[in-house]
Swiss-Prot record:
Phylogenetic classification of the source organism: Bacteria, Bacillati, Actinomycetota, Actinomycetes, Mycobacteriales
Protein name, UniProt field: L-cysteine:1D-myo-inositol 2-amino-2-deoxy-alpha-D-glucopyranoside ligase
Sites where the protein binds Zn(2+): C47, C234, H259
Species, as recorded: Mycolicibacterium paratuberculosis (strain ATCC BAA-968 / K-10) (Mycobacterium paratuberculosis)
Quaternary structure note: Monomer.
Intervals of motif 'HIGH' region: 49-59
A GO-annotated cellular component: cytosol
Length: 415
């Protein structure tokens, strides 16, 4: 699947400290082990959209968080292999297409195209591999075959012989989320699972292959026509594009369970590994009007709508950066107004013919971003330099240009 064009990232003098991120499974901030050895790329797999609606600010905040990681790795001199999927066949997509009377493939392509436009406008660095689930059917089939052969999967008897993954197929299942069984069952039911499905060995067993139903898309396989389950798509794409030794598995915090837990379990089961990724990283939710922003609630603030109103994407980006990536937070007109004012001040300061020395502020921005992407402190450091430049001036003619390059390279905001 075609990705979008990445902006050029300026190279800065020097380097900052190694990146440290909060790991969901370990419940602590710790160093990110980027690359398995000398010359190895830093690897990251981030779950993409299900393309049945336009990109909202919750999506934007998630992909912005991982864009920051990408940028910190580049600043540290790493090659980066970033993979993102598109769940371009799934129940919500099929239901929306049926509701609107459109072909599900046309709906997916339309929304993916809009997503690309939004990501490019927000200056999100593109993944090296941008893969639709429908492009990875063969990879999914291979994984399901291996799980059936090992006994980690089974076929449910009945009119539709669906294939399920045994939740107890790996001893470590549950380590990523750390949730107890009661919480798992609740979230499983709320987030696409089917705990009441007759014939399952365990209510938590997850769908691997949905046998073909009338009127639904399906693909041939050795175990009958059908389509992939949600979690196995990501496991198959990550393993086929990156393989073992994934540095970061990431996405929104609403994906911790069941999606990321089962994606990791599928991969670990097939590869015989204790841990799918070295780091599990999750971004917080964005709210509006007192609630999490979601398609099901209908309280979306769409990136394309903001752009259509003439809001500059750099201001959207700065507004999202004003909060820490892991925290749930609310978007508001005030957040946007403050971001717009900040952008204006930064641009005024970096357009000056000279300013205060930039060495210290760039070092502090690097330090704050290396500390679990502490963007509020990074922005505050830049605000301090901006105030000094506007109020007191300076004599370093290279400083304004260098600060602008640092803001571009490290935060993705073009001044």
């Amino acid at each position: 699947m075609r990705s979008w064009s990445s902006p050029q990232v300026p190279q800065l003098p020097g380097r900052g400290p190694e990146l440290r991120l909060y790991d969901t499974s370990d419940r602590q901030v710790r160093p990110v082990a980027a690359g398995a050895g000398p010359g190895s790329a830093a690897t990251m797999y981030v779950c993409g959209i299900t393309p049945y609606d336009a990109t909202h600010l919750g999506h934007a905040a998630t992909y912005l968080a991982f864009d920051l990681i990408y940028r910190q790795w580049l600043d540290l001199g790493h090659d980066v292999h970033y993979v993102q999927n598109v769940t371009d066949v799934d129940d919500p997509l099929l239901e929306r297409a049926a509701r609107d009377g459109v072909d599900w493939r046309a709906l997916a392509e339309r929304e993916v195209s809009l997503f690309r436009e939004d990501m490019a406008a927000l200056r999100i660095l593109a993944p090296r591999d941008y893969v639709g689930a429908t492009e990875a059917i063969a990879d999914v089939v291979e994984l399901v075959e291996k799980m059936l052969a090992s006994g980690a999967a089974y076929v449910v008897d009945g009119e539709f012989p669906d294939i399920y993954y045994r939740a107890d197929a790996t001893l470590q299942f549950g380590y990523e989320s750390g949730y107890d069984r009661e919480t798992m069952l609740r979230l499983f039911a709320e987030r696409g699972g089917d705990p009441q499905r007759p014939g399952k060995t365990d209510a938590l067993d997850a769908l691997l292959w949905r046998a073909a139903r009338p009127g639904e898309p399906s693909w041939p396989s050795p175990f009958g026509n059908g389509r992939p389950g949600w979690h196995v798509e990501c496991a198959a794409i990550a393993l086929s594009r990156i393989g073992s030794g994934l540095d970061i598995q990431g996405g929104g915090s609403d994906l911790i369970f069941p999606h990321h837990e089962f994606t990791a379990a599928h991969a670990e089961c097939v590869r015989g590994e204790r841990r799918f990724a070295r780091h599990y990283v999750h971004a917080g939710m964005i709210g509006w009007d007192g609630h999490k922003m979601s398609k099901s609630r209908g309280n979306l603030v769409l990136v394309s709508q903001l752009r259509g109103r003439g809001v500059e994407p750099a201001a959207i980006r700065l507004g999202l950066l004003a909060g820490h990536y892991r925290g749930d937070r609310y978007w508001s007109d005030q957040v946007l107004d403050e971001a717009t004012a900040r952008l204006r001040r930064w641009r005024t300061a970096t357009a000056l013919p000279a300013g205060p020395d930039a060495t210290d502020v760039i070092a502090r921005v690097r330090q704050y971003l290396a500390d679990d992407l502490n963007t509020p402190k990074a922005l505050a450091a830049l605000d301090g330099w901006t105030t000094d430049a506007l109020d007191y001036g300076g004599h370093d003619t290279a400083a304004p240009r260098l600060v602008a390059s640092a803001v571009d390279a490290l935060l993705g905001v073009a001044l």
